Regions:
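N-terminal cap/lid segment of alpha/beta-hydrolase-fold proteins
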Residues: 19-55
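Catalytic nucleophile-loop/oxyanion-hole region of alpha/beta-hydrolase
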Residues: 35, 72, 89-124
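Extracytoplasmic/secreted proteins, especially bacterial periplasmic and envelope-associated proteins
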Residues: 58, 81, 101, 105-108, ...
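Solvent-exposed loop/turn segments at secondary-structure junctions
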Residues: 66-69, 93-95, 133-137
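Short amphipathic alpha-helix adjacent to the substrate-entry channel of hydrolases
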Residues: 72-89
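Primarily recognizes the serine-hydrolase "nucleophile elbow" in alpha/beta-hydrolase
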Residues: 115-166
Length: 166
């Protein structure tokens, strides 16, 4: 009986692990290949952390904090292995960049996600934008002022809902 229980436990564990395989693609540029600004080429990159064997998943675009003066992209541990993708974005920082450069970078990154997430298995109608501190500010500006997203050809006909709304 112990052997059967042990084998059954091992089988269930292996199946559970097989369902939770994640991949991270790092340092993907979200700016045009013809970009000539070296600082922009250096900073405007993103990492995509996504479930490899799952389709039609949601995606969170995550902007790091740092007061627009510091910080680097990272995948928060709280968002890992939750069944959705996380796109961590770097953007230009002050003093090398001035407002609204970081907002424009954020908009271009989100537009890139809208245009490309289906290639990774995600749904482009299930993209959420969030961040910490300065990253939260960038998320809010993109939600409130659609001109930034429109400048990069992203469909700005989306609804902003709070958690719990249908």
């Amino acid at each position: 009986m112990k052997k059967i229980f042990s084998l059954l436990f091992l089988l269930v564990t292996c199946i559970a692990q097989a369902q939770n395989v994640y991949r991270t693609d790092k340092d993907i540029s979200y700016v045009s290949g013809s970009e000539t600004d070296t600082y922009r080429q250096e900073r405007c990159k993103l990492d995509i952390y996504y479930p490899e064997n799952k389709k039609d998943f949601s995606t969170i675009v995550w902007f790091h904090g740092g007061g627009m003066e510091g910080g680097n992209k990272f995948i928060p541990k709280e968002l890992r292995e939750q069944g959705f993708a996380v796109v961590a974005v770097n953007y230009r920082l002050s003093p090398k960049a001035k407002n609204p450069a970081y907002i424009e970078d954020a908009a271009e990154a989100v537009a890139w996600v809208f245009k490309n997430i289906e290639k990774y298995g995600g749904r482009k109608d299930h993209i959420f934008v969030s961040g910490h501190s300065a990253g939260g500010y960038l998320s809010l500006i993109l939600a409130m002022d659609k001109k930034y997203m429109a400048a990069y050809g992203a469909d700005t006909n989306f609804n902003i809902k709070t958690l719990g709304e249908d």
